[in-house]
Amino acid sequence: MNYHLKYWRHYFISHSRHGTHSPFVYKLVDEVIYQKDDPDTILNLPHDIRATGKAEEKKYLLVDRLLKVFAYDQFVFLTEKSLASYETLFKHRVGSYSFRKIYYVDQMNLDLNLLTSINDRDMLIVNEPYLSAEREDYWNKLKDDGRVVVTVDLYRIGLVFFRTGQRKENFLIRF
C-alpha cells in the first residue's frame, strides 16, 4: 500500500488521548505528544530540520519534548546517514544518574538482536516505521516481541517501552 494511503488509514483508525486506557500512555500523550511548543522553540529550530518540512519539524519537536521528560544518561544512534541536528539535541539533553538509555533507530535492515541489551527503563524511538516494507516488517516484529511491553504508533515515529509491571499493549495515536 502507498505510504500516504497508509497514513490516512492510520489517521482514521487511531485514537486521541481519550481512546487510551493506560494511565502511562494517557499521561504520555497528554503531557508530551499533544503538548504545544513555545514560539521561541519553534523559531530556534535547526535550519536543516526547518528545510525538510512541517512533518519533520513536528517529529523533531516531539523528540525534544520526549528527551525533556524521560531523563537519560546514554543514547545510541542506529542510523544510515548522519543526523547532526538530532545528535546535537541528544547531546544537549543528556543527564546523569537516570540509568536509562534511549535508542534512536533510523535504518532499513535491522534485526531484533538489539533487544538483548535493553533494560526495562530503556526506550526506542523508531523513525518512519512505515517508510518501506522492510521497516514496517521490523516495526511489526518489534510490536510482537515478548520483551516489548508498550508501543505507541504515531505513524511517522514509533515509541517502544520495556516497562515491567504493565501488560503488553500497542497503541495507535493520532499525531
Language-model-detected regions and their locations in the chain:
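A short alpha-helical cap/connector motif
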Residues: 1-120, 130-175
